[in-house]
């Protein structure tokens, strides 16, 4: 019984964008007993979760665990540098600001993965002749994304390309009449 009680304390549920939750569930490993998402140690999302873990306030009531992503809280031991060790059974609270930071990190990982997939296809386009929309559809099927459309992902990629290499507007000149 003690093991189950501890397991229930070291997982938390957060509410983020539905497509990011679907992506995280398919992309990262799951804890076998709790079915919670486990982020790999050393990843930016893992570090963000660990940095934002806090003790719940004594006078705060326990919030209902509602959300679309259940996270297995990281457990880092104090290393050579003498850093703090946060026991996830006690440091199991994530503030709304922390949830926003975790969501931003997950969005960054998602966008990086999507862009890497599309750019890889662009590089090999001469051989495969696969259209961008087909690559995006395959990406969506790979991660089981139903909460976002292909058009939204293509628009996201187009914004990224425009931001990385903006087009210079053409300068018009009047013709001089002779």
Indicate where each model-derived feature is located.
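Membrane-targeting and insertion segments and their boundary/processing signals
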Residues: 84-88, 92, 124-127, 131
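Long, low-complexity interaction regions most often at the N-terminus
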Residues: 1-91
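Short amphipathic alpha-helical surface micro-motifs
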Residues: 52-54, 97-98, 134-136
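Short helix/strand-capping turn motifs
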Residues: 89-93, 99, 103
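K/R-rich mixed-charge low-complexity regions
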Residues: 101-178
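Generic detector of leucine side chains in alpha-helical contexts
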Residues: 7, 20, 25, 53, ...
């Amino acid at each position: 019984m003690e093991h189950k009680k501890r397991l229930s304390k070291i997982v938390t549920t957060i509410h983020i964008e539905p497509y990011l939750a679907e992506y995280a569930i398919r992309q990262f490993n799951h804890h076998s007993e709790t079915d919670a998402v486990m982020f790999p140690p050393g990843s930016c999302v893992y570090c963000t979760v660990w940095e934002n873990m806090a003790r719940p306030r004594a006078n705060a009531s326990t919030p209902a665990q509602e959300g679309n992503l259940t996270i297995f809280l990281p457990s880092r031991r104090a290393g050579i540098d003498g850093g703090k060790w946060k026991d996830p059974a006690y440091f199991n609270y994530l503030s709304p600001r922390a949830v926003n930071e975790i969501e931003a990190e997950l969005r960054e990982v998602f966008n990086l993965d999507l862009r890497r997939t599309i750019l890889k296809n662009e590089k090999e386009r001469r051989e495969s002749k696969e259209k961008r929309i087909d690559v995006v559809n395959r990406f969506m099927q790979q991660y089981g994304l139903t909460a976002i459309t292909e058009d939204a992902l293509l628009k996201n990629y187009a914004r990224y390309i425009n931001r990385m290499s903006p087009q210079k507007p053409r300068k018009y000149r009047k013709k001089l009449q002779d």
